[in-house]
């Protein structure tokens, strides 16, 4: 739940922060605006490093709980779970910080200002960093991001458990190789309808403590110095009272990449004058010169620095040990039994079943030998994604299957091929393990092919080991010889289950036609191998839903550099998807009936959708009840997700579910970006998927359709 700030304490923090800043020299002030802020011993101020990572667990700071990557957690479609994960990240951040500071360790990645979550919209599956996000949909991203932040920051009225940071503000999703000079051109309609809603939600609803600007320009303005984004929208319209940080070394890009300033002095002045309080990097050392030249006032510096110190005070850094409840958090919380149990629960929740002809779940009592084949089968890297921590133990898919089957069933393994290269050993012929693949298949009762990607193939610009030289994928194909290995498995005549590890959509058309089952496991975290095995053998029931669209080909996509939403994502695409957003199968069947609305028109307080959901199968399951809204007039988006709830059902059990739709669920933005609820008819769909023809065909059922009629047009102030 969102913490309710104590007004008296907030006023105290602002006064104390301003008083402290007033005692500093200009040189000292400038030093405190760098991400590595040195100690000021004469004022009793300890050194502090603002840079910590935590999109799926505390990253780069030693042992921590390594949860599934963000895109995988998004597939759970579970707001409550995201709050639990956010809280776990905040708790482990506190445990590490409290331990490290007692030993005088104030190094990078060990602080309480956690630069997470990444709430950019995953508009194009080629973007390398998309797996850090919650997918392509503004509503889903907003809901999951809000709950993650609420969990991380805690509910104490006086103090933050940790300070979350919404990044990267605001129109940022590749290309990675161009980010230091790229200008994202976006209409006001797309800006306010797609790219800004999640940031607004985190500021207005979750009270996120920090916002990070992006590397690129948006409509000509560098994001970390944008008057439109930082002042007009974030500060003035949304009344954001936290601090703003640059992405790392992004301010240097103003004069080296974007060419909007003449040099470092002008760059730092532009950033600070528009409200960028913290510089990840060292360029703000030029602020003293900028003040001397009259390009920025010392009062502006005081404003920024005061905001930074209010954050540190909200974290309890200048209060006594016994005043701050979070100071009691010990290092024993890190990688604890409770954290490990939560991690497995989360990994279980993300498993997304894309195809199943009845082969799954596998019955180990009927198996003698299982073949496990593929470059990701025994890969730790394929469990993780980027910005990961270090787990005390990892379980690969191969290990998870071996552990689950024990001595009862023989497991035969082949790496199959290199993840992307022509061969594994430089002296060998191309695809040198294909004969081994065929041999393993011949001996096996069922073949589990574990293919896909890892963070060396999709990630941030310049990732070590990324053979594409930037973090983006060149296409949507399985890399290297992976599809040939899959074909060899299929041609063996044995049942083939494809397990995909990765953080983005792949065009697995051959697998869709020929594999018996497909399980998308994402980057499932340190316990991912256990979760995959549990899903394959029916210990758990897959419940994931796709937070992104799987396309047939990258030819179905607009140009990567085109930020217009036309033709992109499930909301605007005109072609049929391979696997649609919101889709995912189960080992049981859920029935929906008695769908109803609390009103035929949405008033100021919105309306409620109710539906009865029944587990009509023989095993327990957990289903996502999804509500989509479509304005029934020309030139409007496809049906859009506007409501979501998870429901647990035993076989034969029925529950009535209620989902609230606020009036804003019926609003679309006009050309100026103003959200307007037009008079007219709206279709409301409730079920287990989108209402599109492909989803209906794959699910074997259509969502219920209801109608809302708005009698008057009204603009909303959002």
Regions found by a protein language model. Name each.
Residues 672-675, 695:
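Short proline/glycine-enriched turn/loop segments at secondary-structure junctions
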Residues 693-717:
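Short beta-strand elements
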Residues 1-670, 678-686, 690, 717-718:
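Glycoside hydrolase catalytic-domain context in secreted enzymes
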